[in-house]
A protein has these predicted regions:
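Conserved beta-strand positions in the central sheet of alpha/beta enzyme cores
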Residues: 1-2, 38-40, 75, 112, ...
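Glycine-rich, proline-tolerant flexible connector loops at the mouths of alpha/beta enzymes
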Residues: 2-26, 78-85
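A short, flexible beta-alpha/helix-coil linker loop
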Residues: 6-11, 43-46, 80-84, 169-172, ...
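Short acidic, glycine/proline-enriched helix-loop-strand junctions
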Residues: 11-34, 93, 107-109, 195, ...
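A generic structural signal for short
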Residues: 13-14, 50-51, 88-89, 111, ...
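Charged helix-capping and loop-helix junction motifs
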Residues: 15-22, 52-60, 87-97, 149-155, ...
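Active-site acidic/histidine proton-transfer and metal-coordination neighborhood
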Residues: 28-38, 44-136, 145, 209
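Histidine-acidic metal/acid-base catalytic patches
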Residues: 70, 119-226
Length: 226
């Protein structure tokens, strides 16, 4: 399960930045035997790391919260007006990540960058960040929409440069859209990747549980055949 820290700021804090809420998440995780495998700085959809001076604060707060939740991967999103479009923006972001990386290393948290740029551009940013704690959070849906060969990119990046995956093909159910998931799961398995892949699939409010079960059942079946 991936936890979003929310976007609405109250008294200078993100919604989950509350000891009682953190404790409740930990309790529910233990109670239902569902690990908190990652977190997300959702606030970066409002204050993007590519240029907003407020962004580093939210990332630093999120590193602390990720550690408190006993998790290891913090998703750093770059979408909408904050999507990376120019080399200058990518260079700035790589430098910003380099400044944030020491705190992530200290907390043993991976900063996973999720965006709409190519695998090659992502690697250039990682190399600019100069930290083993800055990796790619690979979203097969986003990269497909951006026109990239996702199987080729996954194999090229390798398990050393990918921290986690998002599996989705919105607005479709998995297996009913553009993406052929069998080659994707084959590629992930061939890497020897042993981390987490989260379903970030659309679901209808009135059929939420059924939709989640349908997508999970499908991807498990594909994994068994991979």
């Amino acid at each position: 399960m991936q936890i979003s820290f929310g976007r609405k700021i109250v008294d200078g804090k993100m919604p989950v930045d509350n000891p009682e809420i953190v404790a409740r998440y930990l309790q529910l995780s233990k109670q239902h035997s569902i690990p908190i495998d990652g977190t997300c700085v959702d606030r970066l959809h409002d204050n993007g790391l590519k240029s907003d001076k407020l962004a580093p604060k939210w990332v630093l707060d999120s590193i602390r919260l990720t550690k408190e939740l006993h998790s290891k991967v913090l998703l750093i999103p770059f979408f909408g007006p904050w999507a990376l479009r120019t080399q200058a923006e990518m260079d700035y972001t790589g430098d910003a990540l380099r400044e944030l990386a020491p705190e992530a290393e200290k907390a043993r948290v991976i900063l996973g960058i999720e965006d709409t740029i190519s695998a090659e551009d992502n690697v250039r940013m990682i190399e600019r960040a100069r930290s083993k704690n800055v990796l790619v959070y690979y979203d097969v849906g986003n990269s497909t929409l951006a026109g990239f060969d996702i199987v080729k990119e996954i194999r090229w990046l390798g398990k050393e440069r990918i921290c986690q995956f998002h599996l989705k093909d919105n607005p479709n159910y998995l297996g009913e859209g553009k993406i052929e998931f069998a080659p994707v799961m084959h590629a992930i398995r061939d890497l020897g990747f042993s981390g987490y892949a989260n379903l970030e699939t659309d679901a209808h409010p009135e059929t939420l549980v059924a939709d989640m079960r349908r997508n999970l059942t499908y991807i498990r079946r594909v994994m068994q055949r991979a």
